Amino acid sequence: MVELCDGVLLPCLTHGKKSEVACGDIVEIQRISDAQGVIERTLPRQTLLYRSDAYRQKLIAANITQIIVVVASKPSFSDELLARCLIAAHDQKLATLIVLNKCDLLEAAMIARAQLEPYRAIGYRVLELCAKENASPLRPFLQGHTSILVGQSGMGKSTLINALLPDAQAPTREISTALNSGKHTTTHARLYHLDTESHLIDCPGVQAFGLHHLNFGAIEAGFVEFAAFHGQCRFHNCHHTHEPGCALKKTEQEGKIDARRLKLFQEISQNRC
């Protein structure tokens, strides 16, 4: 579906099975009827967020300026998925915001807040709210950005969209109590206009975020707190696992970097998919 300059939505085909278009792409089309067009060209992208494994890649959104990772007090969220999203954002030089939703669940919120403390400590912005009650604290962070909401299913992304844009009518569903997980309610990425300068993309919930397209250095750079110790290891090609003279392991033992973050780095760098 392509939005034309006048705001009309036009169903469009792509040329060939390998033609990949992402939500947020700016394209040139050719009308083939009053009700359909063909995408002829995708204009150069300023940014591209995507995930990948050894066999394929999945485009998520193009030309975004900010990633908003939505986590919740309940169901519990994955530290690794959060870290992977932030690595991908750092690679594309995107502004980042972590939203902790469902803060009305007080006991669960305390646990989630502690889980996010290492991210606050290294400078990530964390916004706490309850989308069902009041999503307005998020609005100032959206101004002037093309933002994308990402996160696991059940975190409340669609509820946020509906609170910010009541006419959007994004589908929502209760989480599975037995599985402590959400079900996919958004089936494809969709772009919404907040105003002429601010736009918001909602994408399907993700359970995995492969980073096969990023090399070791890009993943290391995505752990922003490691930058202060770059080049201090005994070996220039240190992978910060078992090597003697590793500055990061020494720093972690001294309590200067969070042990959980170092462990996450080791796991992600050894298994980028």
Language-model features: where?
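SH3/SH3-like beta-barrel fold
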Residues: 1-4, 12, 29
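Switch/coupling subdomain of P-loop NTPase systems
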Residues: 22, 38, 62-64, 80-94
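Beta-strand/loop nucleic-acid-binding surfaces
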Residues: 7-23
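Walker A/P-loop
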Residues: 153, 158-159, 163
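Short, glycine-rich nucleotide/cofactor-binding loops
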Residues: 70-78
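Short, Lys/Arg- and Gly-enriched loop/turn segments at beta-strand edges
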Residues: 34-43, 76-77
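Helix-rich effector regions associated with P-loop NTPase G domains
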Residues: 19-33, 43-67, 94-96, 103, ...
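Canonical P-loop GTPase G-domain recognition
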Residues: 95, 105-155
